């Protein structure tokens, strides 16, 4: 089974995360940020990765440190579980609608980190979650997971746009980490 556990404790946050890429989409999430919990649970459900997150942080300051550090830990867990990336499909993409919103995500799980995100939000926050943190979360995750991610979303409702992005990311990841053999998908023979 492709599973991992990662912890991170700083003066700002304390995070424990468990990940199973070959799970059933079971989520057990507690970050103290309801909307963020909902997005992580949605990612778990639609990727079919089992995901357990226990995160505490200095929310009295704001949610930035907590969201950033969850991105770090989830990215590191993905990198650890995938190892040298032997046998995985490597590439994944998805187009996911949510009512008036449409999100597209294309991934290369190939050891090089980069994010291109085309997204505009009308509201500064959804619940207690700053819409500025959507980009920061995915940048941090991509950097630590060593994945390249191109994503775009349009729509009218910021909740729908963000949720469609998380779901599209989930389906793209599910496809990219699918086992398709034993070889590394690279002409170099390594990633």
Curated annotation (Swiss-Prot):
Pathway: Amino-acid biosynthesis; L-histidine biosynthesis; L-histidine from 5-phospho-alpha-D-ribose 1-diphosphate: step 6/9. One of its GO terms (molecular function) is imidazoleglycerol-phosphate dehydratase activity. Its EC number is 4.2.1.19. InterPro entries: IGPD_sf (IPR038494), ImidazoleglycerolP_deHydtase (IPR000807), ImidazoleglycerP_deHydtase_CS (IPR020565), Ribosomal_Su5_D2-typ_SF (IPR020568). It comes from the Archaea. GO terms for cellular component: cytoplasm. It is found in: Cytoplasm. This is Imidazoleglycerol-phosphate dehydratase. It comes from Methanosarcina acetivorans (strain ATCC 35395 / DSM 2834 / JCM 12185 / C2A).
